[in-house]
Amino acid sequence: MRTWKKLVATGAAALLGTVTVAAPVAGAQEPEAPAPTSLAEVLLADGDEFDRNAYDFDILTQAVLTVLAEKPDSPVAALTDGSVPLTAFIPNDRAFWTLVGDLTGQYYGFFKVQEEKVFNAVASLGIDTIETVLLYHVVLGDPIDSDTANGVPFGTPLTTAQGGDIVVKPIFPPFKWIALGDNDPNDFDPFIIPSKFDINKGNPQIAHGIAFVLRPLDL
């Protein structure tokens, strides 16, 4: 696997550029505030490896790594800088398994998703396509927590970092059932997994796990 920490550092540097730090005032002893946690750090928390858990985010992690390795200046690098406020809707490994099956007719495993084969199929789509799909899952600006998403009017649009819109659909607010409309009207709408609400809450970057991949065009 690629060295994640090196790629994260490269992506953050590309995003931030050169930063000049002012010298502290003599005698000042104020403790430094901890740096906010980025979603890149959260994605790395369970390791940079494929595994047998189809409901975590290994394929997404590898997709981010692949884009940053080939395109360090990509807007995807925002995920490595915890100070950039954003909301990401992150598909789990099963979601990518479904996408690859829909696109190719080939389903790699079932009860045990063959994550590396699924990722290789995703990678075969090309860097620019992967980048476009990733950015379609990111909304820049103040983080949108689950309570906020659950409370908006049905059909509220959100403009993504890719430039296209997704639509928030609170289906049954008392139970926080929230779907997301994308640009593929012929397939199931992704929905937010209730157990994966508000990942990294309390930081400028927040994520919600989703059960299908958002599609920026009609497949």
Predicted stretch roles:
Residues K5-T10, A22-L219:
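Mature, structured domains of secreted/extracytosolic soluble proteins
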